[in-house]
């Protein structure tokens, strides 16, 4: 898919930030396709998934109107986006804009006797210079034995975190990042 191509390019090298510090103001770094363009645009893909289409496009319109015929920094975008959505994206920007690399997920799941479904989410980082932990909403899709589906969102705030959620059918499979909503490489999901 189109997004998978971006993921493959971005994760082809473990490190690198979207943010370009003043000490790195060289044209090859400012216009780096993997970091400035591909990883930078993937931050927008993730933000769109996190806030939903309507909120995302309204926030983009507000930002565009606010900075029309002017210049803006990444922090100007963050402030405008937060004002439009009413959400705090400090941790997101610390991890994804200023931080290097990306998380690699290992997710274990099991269905309980009451049909609820439990998950254990662990993550490692692509490089030791990456943030110690990427706080992130995680997209999960559960498919049932009769074809039912449930799209779940796990708010992953710590490593080795456990979740138990209600489910009204018998699960046959679980998919993670099923529409490439977030940036990760080779996640594993096991029962």
For each feature predicted by the language model, list its residue ranges.
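Hydrophobic alpha-helical and helix-loop surface patches within well-folded domains
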Residues: 1-121
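Residue-level marker of positions within ordered structural domains that often coincide
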Residues: 49, 98, 124, 145, ...
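Composition- and surface-driven signal marking solvent-exposed, interaction-prone regions
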Residues: 58-62, 132-136, 154, 188-190
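Beta-strand-rich binding/interaction modules
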Residues: 103-105, 109-176
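Extracellular cysteine-rich microdomains
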Residues: 146, 190-191
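Short acidic/polar inter-strand loop motif in beta-rich domains
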Residues: 178-190
